[in-house]
Amino acid sequence: MKKKLYEGSSKILYSAEEDFLLIMAFSDKAVLETGETVDISGKGVLNNSISSFLMGKLEMIGIENHLIEKINMREQLIQYVEVFPIQVIISSVACGRFVKEFGMDEGYVFDKPIIDFKVRSREFNYPIVNEYQIFNFGWLTMDEIRTVQAQTLRIYDFLSGLFIGIGIRLVECKLEFGRVFNGEESIIMLTDEISPDNCRLWHINSNEKLGFELIENEPNKAFESYQLIANRLKEK
């Protein structure tokens, strides 16, 4: 029987039979900015499908990631990764904190994508951290930071093109990385998920918000939004 190891806001990790592998299950839960938890029935199934598809596409262009296989409607078999204590947020358009903290007009297009790092800590409200702090805190080496930045840009460029092809704009994406060890050597690997839960996705023509942004404002429309994204990706 599999053992529950960790439960987050939208995913649960279980032990697997093989060493260094885990089972990741997608739930229907979503945590609002207020801290309230809501259920969007069927969201987990769609996120599993979307993330499996996108991770598979990234593997094809040489981006190492934790996905081994999708094993059922809600679960994936994944590689164990020693996850870095940071989130990597890449934005090509003013949204979220750029509007709230800098007073920018939502939708303003940056000349180049902006990469931010945040500490993976709900307790401390995910504070922004810079690369020199990350290095001096002993979390990543400078070479690892550069690798993460380069991979983030490559991932974002690829996904942006893929989403444009289905009439959707990838405005922002939150990524997580970690180390996988092979003896004394290690490689940096993409982990967590890529889904409407951690990507800001807008209709390319109308800028209508899709995915998690709808859960905050129009939760009754959220499932249809996730389903639209999944259906369009199936056609690729």
Curated annotation (Swiss-Prot):
Catalytic activity line of the entry: 5-amino-1-(5-phospho-D-ribosyl)imidazole-4-carboxylate + L-aspartate + ATP = (2S)-2-[5-amino-1-(5-phospho-beta-D-ribosyl)imidazole-4-carboxamido]succinate + ADP + phosphate + 2 H(+)
InterPro entries named among the record's database cross-references: SAICAR_synt/ADE2_N, SAICAR_synt_PurC, SAICAR_synthetase
GO molecular function terms attached to this record: ATP binding; phosphoribosylaminoimidazolesuccinocarboxamide synthase activity
Protein name, entry field: Phosphoribosylaminoimidazole-succinocarboxamide synthase
GO BP term, example: 'de novo' IMP biosynthetic process
Keywords, comma-separated and alphabetical: ATP-binding, Ligase, Nucleotide-binding, Purine biosynthesis
Keyword Ion transport among UniProt keywords: no
Pfam families per record: SAICAR_synt
Top EC class, one word: ligase
SUPFAM superfamilies documented for this protein: SAICAR synthase-like
Lineage of source species: Bacteria, Pseudomonadati, Pseudomonadota, Alphaproteobacteria, Rickettsiales
Keyword Nucleotide-binding: yes
Family: Belongs to the SAICAR synthetase family.
One GO cellular component term: cytosol
Protein's pathway: Purine metabolism; IMP biosynthesis via de novo pathway; 5-amino-1-(5-phospho-D-ribosyl)imidazole-4-carboxamide from 5-amino-1-(5-phospho-D-ribosyl)imidazole-4-carboxylate: step 1/2
Gene3D superfamilies: ATP-grasp fold, B domain, Phosphorylase Kinase, domain 1
EC number: 6.3.2.6
UniProt superkingdom: Bacteria
